[in-house]
Amino acid sequence: IGTTIISKYFEEIGLEHSFVLATNHIKTNNSYRRAKVLWGDTQKNITKSILTIFESVDTIITQGFIGGGENNETTTLGREGSDFSAAVFAYCLRAKSVTIWKDVPGLLNADPKYFEDTRKFEQVPYSEAIELSYYGASIIHPKTIKPLENLSIPLYVKSFLSPKDEGTRIDCCSNTKPLMPSYIFKDNQTLLSIFPKDFSFVVEENLSNIFALFARYGIKINLMQNSALSYSVCFDPIKDDLLQRLITELSVSYSVKYNRNLRLITIRRYTEDAIRNLIKGKKLIIEQRSRLTAQFLVKL
């Protein structure tokens, strides 16, 4: 509906353009809510149609978030699907750049909902943007970045509130500018701790079964930690009945304990001062660190 309204408005103000249906161009499988792009068919459709249209007009309007399934039924592309649609068209058309418009001035080092003194990145490597989005930065999804990275197409994140501002450029640079810690909060996390009933060790066979179960339930694991006798996973909130079904199924072979309403804190390029300030006064449940990333599951 939105694209139809905009197309009609463009007609009224005399802006020459073409209106095309995304479902005729982005072809997907039939996983309706998280459809996977069929890149071969999509490339063929976009190259054949869109390049021809651009010979007569400079502006094309189409929908984001949706594609056409194998039976020509409408599918959706999942979280941040509209940005992903732009990346798909850009990849297939070998675009010079892509700009996505948000309600923030660019890619920030923290969510303004939690921090008053956020800072904007001027430039970010593709790899770092993917890392940030993987850990939960909501501004961009990894699947939007990957096709652009494959062809070195720059991605600009700008604010529709201040369209003349530069925003953030994501490209093949070597380091973020400026170099500073990034903070990501994921609230309302659930922690499941799983123990073999026979006091055996948690080995590959156990982990394989547990991973398969989480995949079947469509649950994305945000943090995991295993010891010789237990395996713990942290994930986003799910419906009570789904959680109970998961626990019931796990309880056939394992003892299960769980905690809810936790916060997962991730710091990229952390400093010890940043860690101290963030976990001060909080009950620490799990802590993990690598060379560049520190994660803390805490009870507020």
Say what each PLM segment does.
Residues 52-69, 132-156, 192-207, 257-278:
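Electropositive, surface-exposed helix/loop patches at the edges of structured domains
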Residues 123-171, 176-179, 184-189:
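A conserved active-site cap/scaffold subdomain adjacent to cofactor or substrate pockets
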